[in-house]
Each structure stands twice: as C-alpha cells, then as structure tokens.
A protein has these predicted regions:
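Surface-exposed interaction regions that form or flank ligand-binding interfaces
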Residues: 1-92, 132, 141-146, 153-191
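Active-site beta-strand-loop-beta-strand hairpin of nuclease catalytic cores
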Residues: 106-117
Length: 191
C-alpha cells in the first residue's frame, strides 16, 4: 500500500523509496558503463555518454534521500494518542516543510476553523519561524486571520488539540471544505 503525503510513516516510506531508487539507478549506470568498456576496450564510447547522462536522475534520487535522511516519522504511540484524543479534527502527519531559508520537520498538524496547531519533535526546528512561514503561505493563498502555533512539547500540543476538538464538537462543521484546502496548502509546501 502506498503511503500518501500527510499520513503517518510517509517520511520513512519516502526515504526507503529514494534510497532504493538511487541504488538501482547507480547500478544501471555502472552496468551501462562497464558494458561499453568491455565491448570497446575504451571508455570513449556512446555507452559512456549514456551512463553519464543516466547519472542525473540517480543523483537527483540521492539528493532527495540525503535531504530526508535526518528526519523521522511520528512515533506510532503519539499518532494513536492524537487520533484518539482529537477525532473530529483534520490532521496531517510526517511533513518536512521547506522555505527559502530552512528545511523544518513537522510531525503532526491539526486544523480547525481559523486555528492551525503543529507538533515538531525535532529540537532544531524553529517554532516561530515555522509558524510564521505557514501563516505567510496561508495569507498568500487568501486565508487571512489564521492563528498558527507550533509546539515542541507534545503534552502542550495534545492539550491544545483536545481543546480544539472540544470546540469542534460544539460548533457546526460547515468549514470542513475550507479546512481541507488549508491542509492541502500545508502539504504542498512539504516535501
């Protein structure tokens, strides 16, 4: 089964895909080069050119893997707990948000009305910069007056998500389409 962007385990699945793809593509490049060398006895042949050009997609896969390698997927226990405590909220998991200055991992995000809350377990993630970046992207997409808060503390994030879930239980759910668009925008700025 394919893991879609925003589902738990996405980062792990992508890392495996990129690593396997890079290894296979470099193996093909080496095989093409060796075949050309064996056939002609020289590296100056057409298959060498094909092998060199074949390095481009292989290198792209390797760069994607190297970019994602330091980051982890959300822990299964935290995923289950969030699903249990906030069933009414729209959620997304395992994101690596990219801005022009930084690459910032975000384990989970919940969306309800005009509020977006996220949890980043990586201590190198700058909470304020990530929140500002998400808010700016949402503003650029005509979602003004959004409140974006990123937490490093899982307990604080979970209590905020529970509070948002309680508010969602009381309010009518006419904003689901809007929340799905907000979630899609956040996923679009993620690797």
């Amino acid at each position: 089964m394919r893991t879609e962007k925003g589902q738990p385990g996405y980062v792990k699945a992508r890392k495996q895909k990129y690593l396997l793809g890079a290894v296979v593509e470099f193996a093909i490049v080496i095989a093409i080069f060796v075949t050309g060398y064996i056939q002609t006895g020289s590296r100056l042949n057409l298959l060498t050119v094909v092998a060199v050009v074949g390095c481009l997609p292989a290198a792209k896969m390797l760069v994607e893997f190297i970019t994602m390698a330091p980051y982890k997927s959300i822990e299964e226990a935290k995923y289950q707990e969030l699903e249990e405590k906030a069933p009414l909220l729209l959620k997304a998991y395992d994101m690596i948000i990219t801005s022009s200055q930084k690459v910032m991992p975000l384990d989970a995000v919940v969306v309800s009305g005009h509020i977006v809350c996220g949890y980043a377990s990586n201590p190198k993630t700058d909470e304020a910069a990530l929140a500002r970046h998400i808010k700016d992207i949402l503003k650029d997409n005509h979602y003004d007056k959004m409140t974006v808060k990123i937490f490093h503390d899982y307990t604080a994030f979970l209590s905020r998500a529970e509070g948002m879930n309680n508010m969602a239980a009381v309010e009518q759910k006419e904003s689901l389409r809007r929340e799905k668009k907000i979630r899609k925008i956040i996923l679009n700025i993620s690797m």
